[in-house]
């Protein structure tokens, strides 16, 4: 039956420091992954699971806290691939801090998310935008 699937490990093309690692994306808290001030450029996030799982969908959550959401870069266009060589989904994410569902409907042991474009951070109350790409949570739903 369908249930949340938690990765056993992840890799990110970069992170701001250890406090902003990709593990924060599946810790069910409001901690975030942030890149190393690259504005989402060439971002790749890769998640590995203990077994091959049939993934129905994933849910991506930008920073819920409005100041972080406004001032950080956010993923816009993403490409999702897996260890199944012919599988690919491209999706344009909304520039908001609500949960966004993306249907996968594929078997995979590894899921890779590439950020192809981004929404820039914006000034807030006279404070400059951040240069970091930020994301709060990715939930994976599937059947093992």
Each model region followed by its residue ranges:
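Secondary-structure boundary elements
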Residues: 51-54, 110
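Hydrophobic beta-strand segments within beta-rich accessory/binding domains
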Residues: 45-47, 56-58, 113
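Trp- and acidic/polar-enriched beta-sheet ligand-binding modules for extracellular glycan
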Residues: 38-44, 64-144
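Generic detector of ordered secondary-structure context
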Residues: 50-51, 58, 105, 130
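A short beta-strand element within beta-rich, extracytoplasmic domains
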Residues: 53-68
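Disordered, acidic Ser/Thr/Pro-rich linker "stalks" and the adjacent N-terminal cap
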Residues: 1-48, 66, 70, 143-144
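Intrinsically disordered, low-complexity N-terminal regions enriched in serine/proline/glycine
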Residues: 15, 25, 53-56, 86
């Amino acid at each position: 039956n369908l249930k949340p699937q938690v990765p056993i490990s992840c890799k990110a093309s970069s992170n701001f420091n250890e406090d902003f690692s990709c593990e924060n994306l599946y810790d069910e808290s409001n901690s975030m992954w942030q890149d190393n001030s690259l504005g989402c450029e060439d971002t790749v996030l890769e998640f590995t699971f203990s077994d091959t799982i049939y993934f129905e969908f994933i849910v991506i959550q930008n920073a819920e806290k409005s100041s972080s959401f406004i001032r950080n870069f956010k993923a816009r266009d993403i490409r999702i691939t897996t260890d199944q060589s012919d599988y690919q989904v491209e999706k344009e994410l909304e520039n908001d801090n609500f949960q966004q569902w993306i249907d996968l409907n594929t078997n995979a042991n590894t899921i890779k998310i590439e950020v192809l474009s981004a929404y820039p951070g914006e000034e807030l109350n006279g404070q400059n935008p951040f240069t970091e790409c930020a994301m709060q949570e990715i939930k994976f739903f599937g059947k093992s």
